[in-house]
Amino acid sequence: MSQAAPLSHDEELFLKLLSCALHSELPEARDFTGLEEASWRRIHRLATSHAVPAFVGDRILTLPKEALPNRDMRLMIFSEIELTRRGNAYLTKALGQLKKTYEAAGLPFILLKGLSLGCFYPDAALRSGGDLDVLFHSDADYERGNELLRKAGHKLHDDSEVRYGHTAFTYGRTIVENHARAVFFDHKRHNRHFDALVQEAISSGSLITQHHGDYTIKTLPHELNVVYIFIHLFFHWPHWGVGFRQYSDWLLMMTRLKGQLDEEKILSMAKDLDILYPMQLFAQAAIRYLRVSPEIFPFPLLLQDDPHTEQIIRDVIHSGNFGFAQRPIKAQNKWVTNWRKFRFKMRRSRRLYAITPTHASRIIWGSVFGHLMLMIRRRR
């Protein structure tokens, strides 16, 4: 990656607030006393673009009166916190309904990421909700699940990749994503390896049971989930970028599970999937910029400061949630849009090659092939 400019003062303040949220600490009033309105707007914009407005906003509202932002900003933050709480309550209810639907049809599933990660947060209701991602135990169950939602009248999204194990349906006020596979690496051998790990967890009965309201749900075993949540972060990062919600998910999970994880198992999986060095870089960045304890990481850390660490944190800050803050602007002509995307990914793959050569080398061709297949399927 190219040499990055130093963090701005507002970016540093945002990271301080995020760090306080991660550690359930109160922010230092002196850092924010007399802060200009323009700086508060930039901090709030960062929190929003990274899908952590309630998580960070909750810390802002703990500041003493002299350090708080103006009244309008405070009301906006309070509203975002309440909306996030209501959104999570709705997701919990929708997941319960979905579980009943699938259970009645004899379709067991695993809840991936999203709502299953709230339990690792200091306050689960402050994690910004997303979609409901479910992983079926077999391809046949996945196909039956898709057909069940179609027949129930739920709209299948046009960008769904049905044959490749990923569909999205409108489900009330949220989206249900059905998965036949948990991961979508550009290297098929990595997909096959992770699929085998999931099937082993299912057959061995080692899935984790979580309680959500008045029902229970199954999630991946903790070691596999730590690797999976990083894969989710990592999959988006080389292509477009990734934000602090995904980063926080990973850090808080390891914080809560400190001392309970099989480190050798995680190290073995990380090596087999060629993601150990990126994991170590993201860990070092969290230690340096978010005051995360080195003791939470269940894998060997880098022994020296790595020059890529600062670029990692800068890239995450610029990316926003799933990279939307830095994606190329959409043009009226789809070919112009595709060309902009191609150029963006070409430059990005060159910058990231030193960090992850195995995966960065496939960014361009995997994306080109994926776009072509989507266009062909739409014409059909």
Each predicted region: which residue ranges?
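Conserved NTP-donor binding/palm subdomain of two-metal-ion nucleotidyltransferases/polymerases, i.e.
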Residues: 2-130, 136-380
